Amino acid sequence: MSDSERTVDIQVVPPYAAYVDSALIEQAVECTLQMEQVAGPVEVGILITDDAGLQRLNQAYRGVDAPTDVLSFAEADDDSAFVRPPDAPRYLGDIAISWERVVAQAAEYGHSRERELAFLVVHGMLHLLGYDHERSPADEADMRAREEEILRALGLSREE
C-alpha cells in the first residue's frame, strides 16, 4: 500500500444520496490531509445523515440532546485492543454530518451547499487531526484560519 492511498468510507442515508457529492467529500478529505502534511495511507469514515441522527449521536457521546451540524470521533491509537498490520492504513476516525444542517446553513450564510458540505468535512477532519476550537480563543482562530486556507485551495473560499 502506498503513502498516497487514502480510504474514505462514505455512507449516505437514502433520502440524501441524490444530493450529496461524494467526490467533493473525497477531495475535501484529501486536500486537508495534504495541507496538514499527513503522510502514509489513512482511512476515514463519513456518515451523511439527518438532524435526528446527529441528535442521537450528540446525546449518546456528548450528553447534548440537540442536533448539530458535524461530529467527529477521533481514533485514539492507544485505545485499540487490536494490533494493526504494519502496512494497514492508519484509521483516523469517523465524521457524522447532518445534510439538513448543510442545506440550512448554506442558506443562512449565503453560499452553496457544496461549500457548506466541504466546510463541515474539513472542520471534522481538522478535529480528527487534533484541532479543537473549544480549547481557547487562539485555538479557535487557528482552526478557522486553517479551514479557510483549505477551502481556498479547494476553490470554495468565501470570496469565490
UniProtKB/Swiss-Prot annotation:
Record keyword Transferase present: no
GO molecular function, one term: zinc ion binding
Subcellular location: Cytoplasm
Pfam entry (one): YbeY
Keywords, ordered alphabetically: Cytoplasm, Endonuclease, Hydrolase, Metal-binding, Nuclease, Ribosome biogenesis, rRNA processing, Zinc
One of the protein's GO biological processes: rRNA processing
E.C. designation(s): 3.1.-.-
Cofactor entry: Zn(2+)
Source taxon at top rank: Bacteria
Amino acids binding Zn(2+): H123, H127, H133
Cellular component aspect of the GO annotation: cytoplasm
Main location: cytoplasm
SUPFAM superfamilies assigned to the protein according to its UniProt record, in alphabetical order: Metalloproteases ('zincins'), catalytic domain
Co-factor remark: Binds 1 zinc ion.
Gene3D superfamilies assigned to the protein according to its UniProt record, in alphabetical order: Metalloproteases ('zincins'), catalytic domain
Its job: Single strand-specific metallo-endoribonuclease involved in late-stage 70S ribosome quality control and in maturation of the 3' terminus of the 16S rRNA.
Family note: Belongs to the endoribonuclease YbeY family.
HAMAP family: Endoribonucl_YbeY
The protein, known as: Endoribonuclease YbeY
Provenance organism: Roseiflexus sp. (strain RS-1)
Gene name as annotated: ybeY
